[in-house]
Amino acid sequence: MQLTKITGRLPLFAFIMLMCASSHAAAQAGSLDPTFGNKGVATAPMGAKAIAIQSDGKIVVAGAGVSNSQFFDTLLRLNTDGSLDTTFGSGGIAYLTPPGAGSAPLGFFALAIQPNGEIVAAGATQTEQGGYTNFVQVALVESNGSLDTSFGSGGFTAPNMIAFTPYNVTGTEALALALESNGSILVATSYSNLLVRFTSSGQLDTTFGNGGIVNLANQGPNTSFAPTQIALEKNGKILVTSGGVAPAPLVQAGTISRYNINGSLDATFGAGGTAACVASASALLVQSNGKIVVAGSLTSKLNAPPAGNDVGFGVVRYNSSGILDKSFGSGGVAVADFGTSAPLSGAFAVAIQANDEIVAGGAAAQGALNQSFDSAFALARFTGAGALDTSFGSGGLVTTTLVSGSSNVYSYVTGLAIQTDGKIVAAGNTAVDQGFGSGTGAYVVRYLAQ
């Protein structure tokens, strides 16, 4: 009788186990994480430019936002489940503005978290000094979202660096940021193309370059190149990428340069300190083995079409000497083809997983060239050898449509981060009519890694 009862339960037990196994199998790498936000997606009333993950797993997003009809430098913090962290700022959002009359914040464009949990964010502020002029701004924010007033002036530093700009431009913005091991802060700026070092207290570090400022190599008025990212090698040397559209032919291109700790160009890297890049060099990281990974937009998979509109994902790897790593991809270059030739595809962010696999994030156009201005969040994952990881998404590629039912919706990833459990967190934005219409806000999306 007892044997009969046990045998009668076996089919139900087997069915439950089968369902569990099927559910696990369905959760493929690259799938949205259903435990985060709303089915893997969290939204925020701001524009997102950068993302970082704290040691406790909370997610910080930097950008710009509007509160009470005023524009602010904005930080957002999410709990690990994608909900707003109400212990941060006002209900999870910190709206910040630099002190001083006539200063208007333009937003944060870069972000890093110090070992003590304080947040460093960099961007730009606009002043009315002889007309509207943009200045670099760096802010130090306490873990509760309030400004650390011991830093700079009231928590912000925004030095006037126009005298250092090499091309007679009238302003500058911080686009990239990195923290050195001694607490110093490195910032790379647009328009003026400067590399700037601040002390941990927010002052220009006069031991670096010329009074704390270095004019970046291979930048000038004949290109649209601008600094995009900073990364530090284990020995403290400084890598800086710049990218844009080369003037002739019109193709996506970039450079990567290396600087010594004192700000001098490291002539042992590449050709005299700089290496060329076939991609727009939008993002930069250093792998655990010292190899250098650059991700960006690639024109026509290395062949320039008319007007340079055919753009895709490109990941380029260099040895530590600045020479292309020919063991990676095809001659050092790996390409992700999302099956479209519209001009809105490209990689803008990169992250490296614990196993040294590379995740690139950006936008994938949802239509043919000159026929659609729609794009989706896009990820591509590459193995350490530069091949697409076919266990991820569909053949190594993932696209996520965040806004449906509208036309000309441009969705794109601006930042990537990897959690300690390997999950991939992407931050980005959507905009209607390529950003010339109304925006729909920021999105933070979490993907399963395995």
Question: Which stretches of residues belong to each language-model region?
Answer:
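Bacterial N-terminal signal peptides that target proteins for export
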Residues: Q2-F13
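Extracytoplasmic mature domains of secreted or surface-exposed proteins
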Residues: Q2-L3, C20-Q450
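Bacterial N-terminal signal peptides
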Residues: P11-S22
